[in-house]
A protein has these predicted regions:
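Short C-terminal tail/terminal secondary-structure segment
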Residues: 2-6, 234, 245-258
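Active-site helix of classical SDR
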Residues: 128, 166, 174
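Alpha-helical segment proximal to the catalytic Tyr-Lys
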Residues: 133, 179-183, 242
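A conserved structural motif in NAD(P)-dependent oxidoreductases
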Residues: 218-229, 240
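Residue(s) in the substrate-gating loop at a strand-loop-helix junction
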Residues: 148
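Canonical Rossmann dinucleotide-binding motif of NAD(H)/NADP(H)-dependent dehydrogenases/reductases
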Residues: 8-38
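Substrate-binding pocket helix/loop in short-chain dehydrogenase/reductase
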Residues: 104-105, 109-117, 159, 214
Length: 258
């Protein structure tokens, strides 16, 4: 089988959390373009339904929308059950939901800290382990987690200690699960995007000064685009990545090289 065929996801089933918009929307689109049926999982069900409709019309794949609070164990279990029942199985997933709260550490409240850790790290544990249980009992699968270059470096000038810590945690969780499940044919990897020009970032006037600083610091001199993450996730979900597990892929335009 040639490499292009090995990259295909024909007949496979999966889901993406935080997929109504931004990075998750693009990775869900990528999976569908590669031949998979995909569930768009998000708390904002109205936008998720619109996204599902757009992807289904563009790709001809079965795309469903599911409302889910990824920090709630029962809700995540219900979501995974729905994916399996409506799509007919579960071969891959992308745990992508996340938030960021910028505040100096000495001013950040404990509630703010817990909110970031809960959404960015605890939800990944729930998503991975609940999806993983199904995969472990059904021959294997591929799990992809969204970490961040913020797990490798300390971002400046914005203070975001909770976000940085949560993403470092995602990377170590990824490695831990990869080792535990390696012999059971469940692969677990993470992607660490740099500054990505999602709609929420580029449409916010108050972020323009920050974007200018980020671009000035970046070797490529620009933000990444969500579409530039599509190739890596398809690779990780596919048979082309059969020997790839426990790895973190930094896609940051060389931002973390210095």
């Amino acid at each position: 089988m040639g490499i292009i065929e090995r990259m295909r996801l024909d007949g496979r089933k999966g889901f993406v959390t935080g997929a109504a918009r931004g990075i998750g929307k693009r990775t869900a689109t990528a999976f569908a373009e590669a031949g998979a049926d995909v569930a768009i999982v998000d708390l904002d069900i109205e936008v998720a339904q619109q996204t599902a409709k757009e992807i289904a019309e563009a790709t001809g794949r079965k795309i469903i929308a599911i409302k889910c609070d990824v920090t709630d164990e029962a809700d995540v279990q219900k979501m995974v059950d729905t994916v399996v029942n409506e799509l007919g199985g579960l071969d891959f997933c992308h745990a992508n939901a996340g938030i960021c709260i910028n505040a100096p550490a000495e001013e950040m409240t404990y509630q703010q800290w817990l909110k970031v850790i809960n959404v960015n790290l605890n939800s990944v544990f729930l998503t991975d382990t609940i999806a993983g249980r199904y995969m472990l009992s059904h021959g294997g699968g591929s799990i992809i987690n969204t970490a961040s270059m913020s797990g490798h470096i300390v971002n400046v000038p914005q203070p975001q200690c909770a976000y940085n810590a949560s993403k470092a945690g995602v990377m170590q969780l990824t490695k831990s699960l990869a080792v535990e499940w390696a012999k059971k044919n469940v692969r677990v990897n993470s992607i660490s995007p740099g500054y990505i020009g999602t709609e929420l970032i580029t449409s916010a006037p108050q972020l323009k000064p920050l974007i200018e600083q980020w671009n000035a610091m970046a070797p490529l001199g620009r933000l990444g685009q969500p579409e530039e993450l599509m190739g890596i996730v398809v690779y990780l979900a596919s048979d082309a990545a059969s020997f790839t597990t426990g790895s973190d892929f930094v896609i940051d335009g060389a931002f973390t090289c210095f």
